[in-house]
């Protein structure tokens, strides 16, 4: 990790995407599954490592995160709007059996592997 200097407004905007949105996503995925799967044992028995790693942030302190969400709500709401737009776009492609478009999107998005790999490589230096 590298120290990045920026003004507080820029900080709050960027952090709403790379930190706060991750927590919202994790909490809401956990909520969605808990509401659907009334039998908690089913969640435990059926969930794989992907689900566990995706909801890891939902195990964070609600007392800490609720105020953070509200304190940065203007930026977080914008981030959520962008995220929901992307979810709706994917939903539409799934509904319309648009496999080619889904594959193109997923391949483009998959470059996050390289981006995060750079983070790991920079930490090793």
Predicted regions and their residues:
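Generic structural signal for well-ordered, non-transmembrane alpha-helical segments
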Residues: 4, 19, 23, 81, ...
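Long, positively charged, glycine-interspersed low-complexity recognition regions
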Residues: 114-125
């Amino acid at each position: 990790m590298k120290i990045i200097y920026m003004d507080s407004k820029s900080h709050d905007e960027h952090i709403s995407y790379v930190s706060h949105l991750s927590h919202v996503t994790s909490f809401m995925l956990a909520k969605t599954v808990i509401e659907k799967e009334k039998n908690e044992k089913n969640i435990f028995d059926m969930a794989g490592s992907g689900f566990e790693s995706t909801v890891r942030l939902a195990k964070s302190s609600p007392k800490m995160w609720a105020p953070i969400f509200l304190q940065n709500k203007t930026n977080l709401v914008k981030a959520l709007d962008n995220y929901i737009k992307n979810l709706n776009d994917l939903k539409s492609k799934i509904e319309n059996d648009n496999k080619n478009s889904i594959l193109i999107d997923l391949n483009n998005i998959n470059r996050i592997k390289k981006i995060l790999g750079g983070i790991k490589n920079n930490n090793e230096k």
